[in-house]
Amino acid sequence: GVQTCALPIYPKQPAEVEVVLFTPRKEVMTSFKHIVRPEDILIHKRGTTHVTPHRYMLRSGNEKECIDVAILAEGYTEKEMNVFYQDAQKACESLFSHEPFRSMKNKFNIVAVASPSVDSGVSVPRENQWKHTAVHSHFDTFYSDRYLTTSRVKAIHNALAGIPYEHIIILANTDVYGGGGIYNSYTLTTAHHAMFKPVVVHEFGHSFAGLADEYFYEDDVMTDTYPLDVEPWEQNISTRVNFASKWKDMLAPNTPVPTPAT
């Protein structure tokens, strides 16, 4: 099944954690509550030993005052880690070549985390290629050739244990086009495709800022994600059910909506 992870502050006293799932119509689908007891002997305190090797690409300040982004290696063997660090530096430079990241660069720390894989590259199910990699990523998510994700979210966080982070970028060691970004979870993109630099920024917009895709493909697996009678929560798209809550006030008077392509 698909895993997810929450990153609550470690409580000093027993604390209730609640997870609520919503439908695309913003209706509660189901919920789950769990009591976290800090004295529980079955809580594995990871990150105190065996911390994954890592190197800072950018260190602007204390982790308590900055946004900490971890760039994680996927599909890089131990012998390929120098390549990974070079790729991580390219991702960092690409991110801060765009606004608003460029003007806020001093608010970020970027750390490259060298999580090793047994095999080089990533899995491609449609070609019957399954590899043993750090976070078990693969193409063909939802049977879409380009959609590269992993369902092994716990493996991601285990690899990052002991390293300060709030957001995650995973670099896949392949030249095949693809990627994915899941809000408040992770960005995953291929590091050796010609479109790597813009794609990593695009996918980070999904995972970091909660932005939606602004393009459309025929027969896309995500085509029916948004009911047309409900205003999406993402700030960069609209069904015009409540367009005033988005960017309507930024349009010039008499601008037709939808706006014809010119």
Regions found by a protein language model. Name each.
Residues 204-220:
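Catalytic Zn2+-binding segment of zinc metalloproteases
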Residues 107-183:
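Active-site-proximal segments of metallohydrolase catalytic domains
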Residues 25-59:
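Short beta-strand elements
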Residues 5-7:
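Short, small-residue-biased leader/transition segments that mark boundaries at the very start
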Residues 12-26:
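Short, aromatic- and glycine-rich surface loops/edge beta-strands on solvent-exposed regions
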Residues 47-97, 102, 112-122:
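Fold-level signature of zinc-dependent metallopeptidase catalytic domains
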Residues 81-84, 179-203:
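Short pre-active-site segment immediately N-terminal to the catalytic Zn-binding motif
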